[in-house]
Amino acid sequence: MLDTILAKVVGTQNERELKRLRPIVAEVNAFEPAIKALSDDQLRGKTAEFRQRVANGEMLDELLPEAFAVVREAGRRVLNMRHFDVQLIGGAVLHKGKIAEMKTGEGKTLVATLPAYLNALEGNGVHVVTVNDYLARRDSEWMGKIYRFLGMSVGVIQHDLVDAERQVAYASDITYGTNNEFGFDYLRDNMKFELAHYVQRGHQFAIVDEVDSILIDEARTPLIISGPAEESTDLYYEVDRIIPRLKAGEVIRGDAKAEEREALESTGDFIHDEKHKTVTLTETGIQKAEQMLAGRLNGGHLYDLENAHIKHHVDQALRAHVIFHRDVDYMVKEGEVVIVDEFTGRLMPGRRWSDGLHQAVEAKEKVKIERENQTLATVTFQNYFRKYKKLAGMTGTADTEAEEFNKIYKLDVVVIPPNRPLRRVENPDLVFRTETEKWDAIVTEIVDEHKKGRPVLVGTVSIEKSEKLSTMLDRRGLKRGTTTGGGADKHVVLNAKYHAQEAEFVAQAGRKGAVTIATNMAGRGTDILLGGNAEFMARQQCLAEQIAERLPKGEERFLEDEQFVYFFHIDAFYRVPKADYHRIFEHFRRQCEIEHEEVIALDGLHIVATERHEARRIDNQLRGRAGRQGDPGASRFYLSLEDDLMRIFGSDRISGLMQKLGMEEGVPIEHGMVTRAIERAQKQVESQNFSVRKHLLEYDDVMNKQRENIYALRRQILEGQIRLQDEDGQETALDTREYLIELAEDILDALIDTYAAKTADFEEWDLDALNREVTRVFGLDTGNFDFADQTSDEIRDTLWTKISESYDQKEKLVGREVLQRVERDIMLQIVDAQWKDHLYSLDHLKEGIGLRGYGQRDPLIEYKKESFALFQAMKERVDEEIVRYLWWLRPILNEEAPIARRPAARRPPPLILNDPGAESASVLGASRAQAPQASPFTRSQPQPQQQQQPPRVGGDDALPKTVRRDEPKVGRNDPCPCGSGKKYKKCHGAAA
């Protein structure tokens, strides 16, 4: 109530923000006459002038009005598109690092040119992020004309580019690409062995188109680069066979109380909770599963710790059979399970569910099971995009998620007013009792509107529902085809497989009499023009003429093949002479103008929504397809009490409301109270989904800090300067050799503290163990050392002299340059192998951490503690393995080297790894797809006294024994325990 009163008095926050931005628009408009008077060369020269002013210290905010005026004029000259005042406001919002909500058809693509140009003047690169390759390519070519006219370079990242092409694209002033490509390039860069092979050059400023889709809808799906694990696939088939023999219990709908849940458990072997999307074995189900899997279980019980992996397989098989449905959540294409995006309905080839779920679905569908993958690198979109120093976004629907944008990304949402008043009529929802009644009413509505000539766009929630509706329309005389409108009694269905073809269909959805069925988000990014899009129609005509000339007679069936038409289109279009194209275009332009007026007279595009989505934002996106730029239009949602949202989240409130209003068979209820009740249910779901995403982010933030630490270390190794912090937070940069010496000294100090400490009596020392550990870590033969009469400091000094001499000898024989390259490659491989194992450990930790809640402990706090302990242990292993590998290396003498591999004269001799164990693998003998060739390594036979194993990368041997001590270790850079305030190595550690 108070908020409403304040809003009336001082205006809403959005209104106040718009008020602050309007003077900027006035300044841009004031520059327009002078900028218009410039010649093309003078206008182009403004870019060099702006760059110089930035170099001289002028702020971008000061340049903004004039720079925006320059871009506006370039748009007018090159594209015949002049930025509206509201688009200037949108550009200013993006430049300030906020989200601009602009309705469909308001020209978001053109708006992005303003802040992209302005921020590119600094020379650090601007990334414009889109949802698919087609839009990235289209926008880079379309808007790229403005940038190139002004002397800026434009690049586009496509999924099939090689690294050299990606480097060129990222080196451009402005780079277009998809969220997936930007994220994967970041991960791939941090797996490379040469800085020169990196493709990205930093994360300065990103403008995210369809920001809600990328930062919210896809936030729960991390980007993962993985490699095959070794686990057999037999268990998936075995577990899958038992699921059909389990009896399904009653389905839990809504929130069930404990006693209700207990009663439901007696109805079958498993119960399905629709609201929380879980499926759980009951007591009888557990007993049956144990009987059927008796041969696999270690012991008698499925829930025993040693059977945890089998329990995991059973859980995933249940989810695959009960929760995941064919043609809704996935499709089977050419013997492969392909995921369907739950928000867009698009197929996502190449994407796989993790944790064995994808394999469980493959077993269910009786297709080949691909081996489970092990994660090599991963990042969520949330943490990737938070790397940018400045982030902005634009979409038609962000205000309903403003809280999430603010809390997760620190992004404010500003709603930009439309250039023309909205004329779309949003009709109240029609609610039916059953799904059958609803679908019959939808078909009748579509047929009736089509007879009038009014274009209809139907939004469905899944491919399955699209196909169902298409079949029903076929029966009513509206046949399925590859085109619609223009007087034909046909409809088209977007299967959301080819984005370019999808855009062509959506562009024609405004033609007179057109009927288009699409999943809710299909074709996003393409304007629906009333009367049709002449440019797209001209392309289609060119395609048809080329097909008529080149397609053999009798093969016309290929015209119904969407894949054939799509790939043929690109080649065919470029064969058409320009004069012919312009003639065809003019013909369709006149036709579209006539149809435009006819469709406006019919009240514009009519949106028919077949179901409410869990998020109001998705519903608003569908509504927003009608009524662009002041055009007329209408929308209506058709619902039934059997819809998922109504059944699961609507609770008894809506059902009670329906009874009060009275429901008869086939007669819908149309009432504002029902619509508001449904929106309340949607808000409840949105809140729940936000909590899930926030919860996942809190866990991922822990890994993100560790990932940044490891990636920073990798880069420092590549740069040859590794930075260490002292107790005062001061950084010291060490070259690779200095860093290795520091590590080796720390390890030796730890060994001395453990086995020959100053504070312990001689009788307590374990010199045999010290000798074994020194041999294990440094590869030294300590058999001739006699420490009997030496002090702790003298022992340390003797050992360090030998350790440092052995490394100096390597460097002397092979040269610093060769050894430095070997150091770098070995360090990188050890870091990568240990990081991979650490990710695996974190996955296992996360799986079971939720159980800590039963012990009255916060799982998140426990996860932070244990993951930190795992990370510290991993870093200790990395340090020790690096030292072990590099100290075990020794040069191959010419007489030892095989003739075929003997080094040429005057070349430094290559290095080998002492290999007492025949099964040990050289670090550089592993797969080196990402690594450059280094000095050759081979194996040598051990001397009789050498019984220690050299290190290995990966596997169990990658986890060498960590030195344990009763007292805390005093590092060389730690404060001295004597209390002097000096570093230990400058005080009592000086002699060491």
Language model region names:
Residues M1-S640, L645-L657, Y711-A712:
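Conserved P-loop NTPase motor core
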Residues T962, A991-A992:
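Intrinsically disordered, low-complexity linkers and tails
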Residues D966-K985, G989:
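Short Cys/His-rich zinc-binding micro-motifs
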Residues K103, L110-A112, N119-G123, E895, ...:
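Conserved mid-sequence domains
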Residues G453-T460, E464-S466, E719-Q721, Q725-D728, ...:
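Short, Lys/Glu-rich amphipathic helical modules
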Residues I35, V314, Y330-V338, T344-R352, ...:
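Extended, charged helical/alpha-beta scaffold domains that provide interaction surfaces
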Residues V458, I517, W835, F871, ...:
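Hydrophobic, well-ordered secondary-structure elements that form the walls
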